[in-house]
Structure formats: C-alpha cells, structure tokens
Amino acid sequence: MSNDGKKVKSLSDLSGVGQNILNKLVEAGYSSLEAVAVATPQDLSVAAGIPQTTAQRIIKEAREALDIRFKTALEVKKERMNTKKITTGSQALDGLLGGGIETRTMTEFFGEFGSGKTQLCHQISISVQLPQEKGGLNGKAVYIDTEGTFRWERIEAMAKGAGLESDIAMNNIYYMRAINSDHQMAIVDDLQELITKDPAIKLIIVDSITSHFRAEYPGRENLAVRQQKLNKHLHQLVRLAEMYDIAVIITNQVMARPDMFYGDPTTAVGGHTLYHVPGIRVQLKKSRGNKRIARIVDAPHLPEGEVVFAITEEGVRDAEE
C-alpha cells in the first residue's frame, strides 16, 4: 500500500512519484517495482538524478509493495518447492541437476573447448519453449553470445529434434552478440525492460561469461578491476533470475593449474568471484566420440556425482550404452 492507502501495482502508484520522477526512473532503466526494490539509494539517486532521501523512500515503498521481508524457513521451503525446471534433453543430466535447469538460479557450465558448453546452451534455449509436460516452460530465451559461437543451423536441427517448427523456435530466441565487456554488461542492464515487455522470457544465457573480461583486463595489475566488474555483472544476472523467476545459464572456460600434480590440472576461469555466485556449478569434459561427462562441482542442495550424456545431430540426449 502507498501512504494514501492505494494498492501499489506500478511505479506510478508510489507516493510522490509524479510524471517527472517516473520519466527519470524509466530513462535510468528502473522501469518496474522489482528494479527499484533491489536498487541501493545511492545508485538510484545517481542514475535517476533525484535526492537520496527521495530514493530511500521510493525503495522502501517498492519493497513493501512486493513483500520483500524476512521469511520463515517454511516459507522458503514452499518457494523452493515451486522452483521450475527446464530439461537439458538428457534424462541422466536432468537427474544429476535435480530435475533440470532451475529457475531463480544461476547455473554455470565450465570446461575445455569442445566439452559441450555451447551445445547445451543451444539445446536448453529450445527446451525452454516446450510445454511443461515435456520439460519446458512454454517460454522464450535470451542468448548473449560473447565469442560468436551461436549457430542458427544447430538451433534449427535441435528444434526439429524436439518436434518444434524451426522458424517459430528461432523467433522465440532473442539473440545479441556482445562485442566487449562494457557492451555485455549494458545488454544485461537493459534486459529488465525487455523482460517487462515480454514476460514469456524464462531463460537467459551468457556464452561465455568471462572471455571479454579476460581479454580486456590481462595481468595482475588489472585483476581487481576485472573482478569488480565481473562480480557486478554476475549479481545483476542473479537479481534478474530471482525477480522474474528466470533460469540463468553461464558458460566459462578453464585454465591450467601449474601447481597441481595430482587430480584435475584445470580450473574454471574467474577466481573466487565465480566460485561463489552461481548456485550450481557443473564441469564438462570430453569423452569418446559424441559422449560428454558432466560432474557437479558445487551445489548446496545436490549431491556430488557425474553422468555421461551425448551430443547428437538432434541435440543433447542420453548416451547409448
């Protein structure tokens, strides 16, 4: 409720938000109650050009309208029980992930070149369009490509493999090629407006998350700046996932660990920033032929384990024995 007792459904319902302030908020990218509710007073003040006291009041009222508050563990359990899942195309991989790719969560796939990261991204951008009884969400996908690896030919083949009309399936994928790290971050900053206009969006993919940051901020002298920007970028994606009940998938590369003499000599790029932000981290490895190995590296609610899946002409499938 606003101060005058009116139920708050949009920014214009907030007390003290006239057309002038509303225009400033929208122009700054704060076009919904959710965006305002999770902003900091300082960020909102600077971005919209309004006093910090005004920003604090607007944020407080938006949070009250959205019921952002402490919750009991039972309430959290009920919310988790309502988490939706998207099939990967492989029952074995779905089982490893606890039923598929979760909404409200960031899932990271990392591995060497050819380990299946991009193939999985293509497949899941098709799977999200399926009806719920077939493992989808009747939704659309946003695909942010940082390395130029998106291939419409694979989308077309996977759509046919899933029984979808290829042109319709491709029309349900919003694609953007990010040319540098600033552009990549700007795309995500603008996503909220797109999601507000098209609530059918249920999946965001960034393939890959770190490539531009590594190229533009090399060396130890740039490490702090790189990690700060990457951390902000990751948290913006998590915020979108939680606000709009969307699944977020990021892919990541690996690098050698010269200090490792036993076990896996590689580790995911991104350091501690990427170790802690994704809710689920999955390592992918090549196997024989079209087979790939997926291993849970970190997920607080899932047991460790690994499975084998296959990449076929029609998409990601269970591996044949």
Swiss-Prot record:
Any GO MF annotation of the entry: ATP-dependent DNA damage sensor activity
Alphabetical UniProt keywords: ATP-binding, DNA damage, DNA recombination, DNA-binding, Nucleotide-binding
Binding site for ATP: G111, E112, F113, G114, S115, G116, K117, T118
InterPro entries: AAA+_ATPase (IPR003593), DNA_recomb/repair_Rad51_C (IPR013632), DNA_recomb/repair_RadA (IPR011938), DNA_recomb/repair_RecA-like (IPR016467), DNA_repair_Rad51/TF_NusA_a-hlx (IPR010995), P-loop_NTPase (IPR027417), RecA_ATP-bd (IPR020588), RecA_monomer-monomer_interface (IPR020587)
Signal sequence, renumbered to the chain: none
One Pfam family, short name: HHH_5
GO biological process, one term: DNA repair
NCBIfam families in UniProt: PRK04301.1, recomb_radA
Protein family membership: Belongs to the eukaryotic RecA-like protein family.
Function as written in the Swiss-Prot or TrEMBL entry: Involved in DNA repair and in homologous recombination. Binds and assemble on single-stranded DNA to form a nucleoprotein filament. Hydrolyzes ATP in a ssDNA-dependent manner and promotes DNA strand exchange between homologous DNA molecules.
Protein name, as recorded: DNA repair and recombination protein RadA
Organism: Sulfolobus acidocaldarius (strain ATCC 33909 / DSM 639 / JCM 8929 / NBRC 15157 / NCIMB 11770)
Gene designation per UniProt: radA
